[in-house]
């Protein structure tokens, strides 16, 4: 079928240390049942052969554009650079170590047009150790955009970018916060707040790869913990606006846990800026002195004390967690 008069769909794909996976990712898009695509690969200064592999595919397929970063800039900057050159009427996001079903674009495009909505949300499947496990959502969260927004704030609808298919104008004036991890948790509420309609397509169309230890969604770093910390701080006032008292407490609980984890990880393997560490410490001081600090359990009470008064406890925790992760990966 000719592409004339068929909407262009842009797909933004950050690529970092994905040499063993990026080929499968690209080919899953090349072989879509809908072909009018703009495939944007942003290679984020990978030290492996990811960039060369992207270039090899681009030479053979004029739908592919490759952007190269000279150094690692982070996934938010990478996605923003992709968004800057989007030409399509619709936008999807895929991570370079994941892949998608061959009908993903066609099914999402059909749904968004027939249902006349701003965004289609679909299911993912988790791929780990060769096994694929579908993850489904409760359709009651999608009665209307207000219900979906509330469910998103509460983490009942995953905040991933990669299981959503947007009208391009949803991103017209929005960009991701750079220099932080878990940016999805911060940007999705902002995007959803500006939408008027939503549809849930109850099919697993995206395959999330848990086997890549270099995954851009990895949670095992001080930077990742700081990103989680910031995302929960960001969502507290959004929950307050909706009168979600219990979820405000949940956000505080998660922010404390993320902060004490981030401080411990950073003491064991320094990577955060001083102002980022101070940001977490100041928050923890305020919570420690608060009369209504949420219950965080004995373990995190010890880590909170360590972060504020006995850094050796936090550092030991960081080393222990990194050690456990190394053991887990070796099994």
Task: Give the location of each predicted region.
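Membrane-interface aromatic/basic loop that binds lipid-linked glycans or pyrophosphate carriers
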Residues: 268-331
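Donor-binding/catalytic cores of nucleotide-activated saccharide
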Residues: 96-199, 209-210, 214-223
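Glycine-rich, basic loop-to-helix element that forms the pyrophosphate-binding segment
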Residues: 69-86, 107
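A conserved acidic beta->alpha catalytic loop
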Residues: 35, 43-52, 71-73, 95
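Catalytic core of nucleotide-sugar-dependent glycosyltransferases
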Residues: 205-211, 218-246, 258-290
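N-proximal low-complexity "stem/linker" segments adjacent to membrane-targeting elements
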Residues: 1-30
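Short aromatic/hydrophobic "clamp" motif used to bind/position activated sugar donors
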Residues: 91
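Short loop->beta transition adjacent to catalytic acidic/histidine clusters or analogous donor-positioning motifs
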Residues: 6-9, 30-41, 49, 61-65
